[in-house]
């Protein structure tokens, strides 16, 4: 059985890790970095860039460069948070037929799950390159406060990327796993995981207990805000810069998409610099132009100014902390350790606020960017059966229930219930001779169902005629270890039953997922062909270069006819390569022609090398001879220092 990898699918950055024995390994991507920007760019030629290459070109291609898509995953287009993002994002957020929020690139509508799958595929490839074998299984993390739709959409993204998602695990819980297994402290400890990432905020209170040599991680409570994170901090800086520039120059940059993308980069950079320095300068020449000519932006921002701009955002993290402490039934003073997770927790003001609330310094020995992926990898090892000393008891973040008479939300499973869990309750009809009931399932804490998130609805039909209140309908809720809900309704008199896995009125249908999986597989096949074509072209280029070099040095030793034959074959190959031919067989045939024509040249070189005999000359000629000889024979090795850029074609519908 292959390894189960751990993936932290983040709003801003993603990370992949795996276990080697009892050691965890955070894997570097093809660019040599341990985290990968969660940015996907769709290019004019159908190429898809993921990570750092996508980020680098974002300024020139803002409308087709998608970032922070995790904020949209599993969300309805009408939700106020989505509506807010529509005005801020340079790319288009559109309404899908089922009411979900989708995105658009080059006129193609894409599901957030489909876009996130590109990042997951990059993580999968990163792990495969490291292991040298295929990877098919993963544990993927989500914010603890993600609802059912968002969890299901994340699972769908894994499937589209070609991964069997063995478990969806909450990010703070994963960080607690990474922290708890790394520390030698004995006895029971209560920890608070404060997770402020790129787009989401979570707070979890977790108890780590030693039970007969086994570490038991029990989540006591969780709370958060799935629309609060580093992206919002960046936006405050962007808004401030736009306001200052408008005051000075009279130009509104908020309408200029290219300028906005440059501002986003500058804001992120300034925010990072202000975590260590007291002041930073934003300098963006030629940010825009008007009738009077080009305009340049130069602005100093102090740490105090940044803190004033984001003060209310930091304050918004405190109320969830209060609720989590209350729900866990503990006092602030009983918390032994506070763990900071997520890049935004590097901001000194955030750390100060956390210290002020919990009354103690947060731990500094946890890597906020990697802890979540590490925890996911540990859970992967537990699920594969290779680790027996860890037990994880997670909770459902929000209450689940059904709508009953008068639009009331009747809770079936309360928030912070340990999962997996089951609960059944008997209900009856509201009218005489009612032949069917509609079960509407909601998630949330409001008293009235309409104030909560509708997860889905289904009917139980064929109820025998009877006065109201007589039929007995048993509704059962079953939450699995991924936090995903399965609901059933049964008429106890007839035994008629209807069971569903909640897949909201929204979400991707099975057919849509299958199509996206097939598209991804087709793209993988296309990638392979493109890779082979690139190899052939590189081989051709290298052969042209080495043969020309050899001709310059040794051409005068050949007969005129032989030299002309080589030159003609070279010209033919060069033209094919210059025309951008996508016929691999034709390129290989022309390489073979050059190789055959160059045999005499190779012989002359070796003869000359032997005749000279001197070590220096032998070395020089040997190098040239090897180049022409090996490639003339059609060898396909590429120069050691040539790295093929990853690229991928996406077919338009």
UniProtKB/Swiss-Prot annotation:
Please state, per the UniProt record, what induces or represses the expression of this protein.
Answer: By stress conditions e.g. heat shock.
By what name is this protein known?
Answer: Chaperone protein DnaK
One term of GO molecular function = ATP-dependent protein folding chaperone
Q: Please report which protein family the annotation says this sequence is part of.
A: Belongs to the heat shock protein 70 family.
Source organism superkingdom: Bacteria
UniProt xrefs under Pfam families: HSP70
List the Gene3D superfamilies hit by this protein, alphabetically. Answer: 1.20.1270.10, 3.30.420.40, Actin, Chain A, domain 4, Substrate Binding Domain Of DNAk, Chain A, domain 1
Task: Tell me the PROSITE patterns matching this sequence.
Answer: HSP70_1, HSP70_2, HSP70_3
Q: Which residues carry this modification: Phosphothreonine?
A: 200
Query: Which InterPro entries does the UniProt entry name for this protein?
Result: ATPase_NBD (IPR043129), Chaperone_DnaK (IPR012725), Heat_shock_70_CS (IPR018181), HSP70_C_sf (IPR029048), HSP70_peptide-bd_sf (IPR029047), Hsp_70_fam (IPR013126)
| SUPFAM superfamilies the record matches | Actin-like ATPase domain (SSF53067), Heat shock protein 70kD (HSP70), C-terminal subdomain (SSF100934), Heat shock protein 70kD (HSP70), peptide-binding domain (SSF100920)
The annotated regions of Low complexity compositional bias extend over: 627-639
Organism of derivation: Paraburkholderia phymatum (strain DSM 17167 / CIP 108236 / LMG 21445 / STM815) (Burkholderia phymatum)
